[in-house]
Amino acid sequence: MYLTQGLHRAVQQQPDQVMTICGDRERTFGEVAGRVARLAGALRELNTGAGDRVAMLSLNSDRYSEYLLAVPWADAVLNPVNVRWSVPEIAYSLRDSDSRVLLVDDTFAPLLPALREAVPDLATVIHAGDGPVPDGALGYEDLIAAADPVSDSRRGGDELAGVFYTGGTTGFPKGVMLSHANLAVSWLGSAATGCLGTSGSITLHTAPMFHLADLAYWGATLLLGGSHVILPGFDPGTVLATIASHRVTDVLLVPTMIQILVDHPQVTEYDLTSLTSVVYGASPITQAVLERAMKAFPSAGFTQAYGMTELSPVATILTRADHEQGRLRSAGRAAPHAEVRVVDPDGAAVPNGTVGEIIVRGGHVMAGYWNKPTETQAALRDGWMHTGDGGYLDDQGYLYVVDRIKDMIITGGENVYSAEVENAVARHRAVAQCAVIGLPDPDWGERVHAVVVLHPGATLPLAELREHTKTLIAGYKAPRSMEIAEALPISGTGKVLKRELRKKYRDL
């Protein structure tokens, strides 16, 4: 299969059906196909070759949807850029992937001078916004208007579809290599459950489209010929109004968004009866919030999807029926396309109910990490993806995720690795030692918490630490709380005992 396959099917069967709604713009499948063919033609005229990486740094838009289709149409490879990153992180991903073309919208156009300086090999910038085209950039609509349409390359199968960057423990992100087959297997397997996308669905995109979770919902909706209503980002009032006005049937949300929506003072004033499917995942959710959400959206079935970028991204699904059976703390059972096990450190399966590392196998598992053979070898062993997550299975095959073995913190749906934050915190002149852990947070699922040992006589307010950290890494990774400690608990081998730090807060 290939990523553009759903578009071809829809053009054949329903060319006049609306595919995308973004603000005042509505475009049919037929119109989108024509624009995609011309945008692909423009990319080829710009000397974009087979397998070349094309990046996009943009808030959600209908043009983002066209980018996702035009790049493979042109026989190139996607590189969706995390919009929450700092300039050094963005520049690293562009250099590491050797992306020579960057699409950028109005929001991020001001970063272009810094990015051009940091990425000297960036040959072409395409302005995909509605405002004035920046100096040195090409206009998105101008390119489409001038280019001749080209035939779809039908790039697919095991060929590389995209390099999707995820957080890294060394201070820089890792590029996950996913093929067309990887993504198609995940989309089809998820859709087969009846929980992610249905024929004729109207899917709302308010979660970031650079994120593989929303991309999976986009792909499943595309394969089934559904329509996409696209918001630039998450605003609770706008989300509620959009669901009501466009009769949205499906939406993907992270738990932080769910809590904000159910807390909205006008949530009961909107007609939300069209909403039949709410898919959530990407971070922990409390049972209390989930129960409130099920009351706020009484017509909707709730589905949890667990996985990671390396799994394209779905591994397990907690279906609507499972929610009714009182298993709200479970991450569900293996999706139709996945095989899931829990193992001990030696790779042997552990008995049901015993915590171990979650490993996953299937056609959706990544090819590896871009330019990182050592990390690839560590993650992919004997055909299994070692997730680094701790959990256990019950006797019915339901998975329960209990911890992040690799100290990953999930805050507001975004992955944060403690080592990355520690590296940034430690660069402050007042810091002698530090450790970073995740603590439960009612708004963010988890929050980044720093335990800091200061140099003698030094002081460090939290606000100063946050500002310092945000100059080095993305703002959402900066500590939201901090403790000044006399010393850190250290093991006999010199390692910080983070379990002791967590235990302190658990026992409060």
Identify the residue ranges that each predicted region occupies:
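Conserved structural elements of the adenylate-forming
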Residues: A33-L39, A145, V176-T198, T206, ...
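Gly/Ser/Thr-rich phosphate-binding loop
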Residues: L223, V248-L252, H264-G326, E339
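A short helix-loop-beta submotif of the ANL/AMP-binding
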Residues: D52-R53, L59-N79, V83-V87, Y92-V101, ...
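Conserved pre-ATP/AMP-binding loop-to-beta segment of ANL
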Residues: P15-D16, A146-Y165, F172, L196-I202
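Structural core segment of the AMP-binding/adenylate-forming
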Residues: E45-L46, L69, W73-D142, P456-A458
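Conserved AMP-binding/adenylate-forming core of the ANL superfamily
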Residues: H8, V18-S61, S65-L69, S86-A91, ...
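AMP-binding/adenylate-forming catalytic core of the ANL superfamily
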Residues: W85, A91-Y92, L102-D106, I243, ...
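Conserved AMP-binding/adenylation subdomain of ANL enzymes
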Residues: A184-I202, F210-D250, H264
